[in-house]
Amino acid sequence: MNQFRFSRRPDIGDKIRVSFEFFPPKSDEMEARLWDTVTRLQPLKPKFVSVTYGAGGSTRERTARTVKRILNETTLTPAAHMTCVDAARHEVDEVIQEFADMGVTRFVALRGDPAEGVGAAYRPHPDGYANGAELVGALKGVGDFDISVSAYPEKHPESPDFATDIDMLKRKVDNGATRAITQFFFDNDLYERYVERARRAGIYIPIVPGILPVHNFTQVANFSARCGALVPAWMAERFDGLQADPQTHALVASAVAAEQVLDLVERGVGDFHFYTMNRADLVFAVCHMIGIRSHESEAAGSAAA
């Protein structure tokens, strides 16, 4: 596709709903940054916020602590990530029940990456759930939860073809998934074609675009190569030469993400899930540009008038 089309419709923010992803902090410093981010983004009133679960279930306790704190100290609705990699069924069921007892009603159900990370060979646990579809079924067996699942506009790196990829999404839906959230992408045509494939396969749940504001273009480009996400040439050109200019890099990044969202709105999309990387600056700026404003901002604007 060419570059995104930028909408100038004044009511655009009324048509957009957002959610945010956080990851559990590993240190006191990272925890402080996370809660600064939560505090900054909470007034935007996201539909929910998700908290990730590390590769191989490595962040189980930290994920639980973060979710509990969001429940107890904010007005936000948390969605706990659940994975089934490297875990027996009874271990996964125990974690599900732990979150349910805590008051969690939303989950993001993922097969998960091996402990070795993205690209490592996946081997189902001999006594575990084999994939994300089975995990969705397990969640529904515990309670009538709101369950988000993953979707891949450029197909999962392990899928041999799109038919296999779409079939797995269909199995998740048949087992009770509420919505799908996509891996990040930078070519909206690819997302649109993926949604068309899903609809032809009889999948009618919302397929929510995952939006990744680019805090570090080099890192994003490298990670994209590992997980099979295309970085368009025009986008690389926009960030070219900005490695040592973080201020301009941030301005470009917020504009690129806002343009992507507004182009998708013009195509009929209304829900967006932002991968925050536990940083508020770009996400807050993008939300402001697409018309999602905090009550504090509106009050300040009224006072200035």
Question: Predicted segments — roles?
Answer:
Residues 2-8, 29-32, 57-69, 88-94, ...:
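Active-site-adjacent beta->alpha loops and helix N-cap segments on the catalytic face
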Residues 12-17, 45-48, 74-78, 103-106, ...:
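Short, well-ordered coil/turn segments that N-cap beta-strands
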Residues 92, 143-231:
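Active-site-adjacent structural elements that line small-molecule/cofactor binding pockets in enzymes
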Residues 2-51:
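Conserved N-terminal beta1-alpha1 strand-loop-helix module at the mouth
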Residues 3-7, 126-152, 202-254, 259, ...:
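Active-site pocket-lining/capping segments in soluble small-molecule metabolic enzymes
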Residues 21, 49, 99, 172, ...:
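Conserved, mostly hydrophobic/aromatic
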Residues 17-35, 78-90, 146-164, 240-255:
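Active-site mouth loops of central-metabolism enzymes
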Residues 22-25, 52-56, 81-87, 110-113, ...:
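Active-site beta-loop-alpha junctions enriched in small/polar residues
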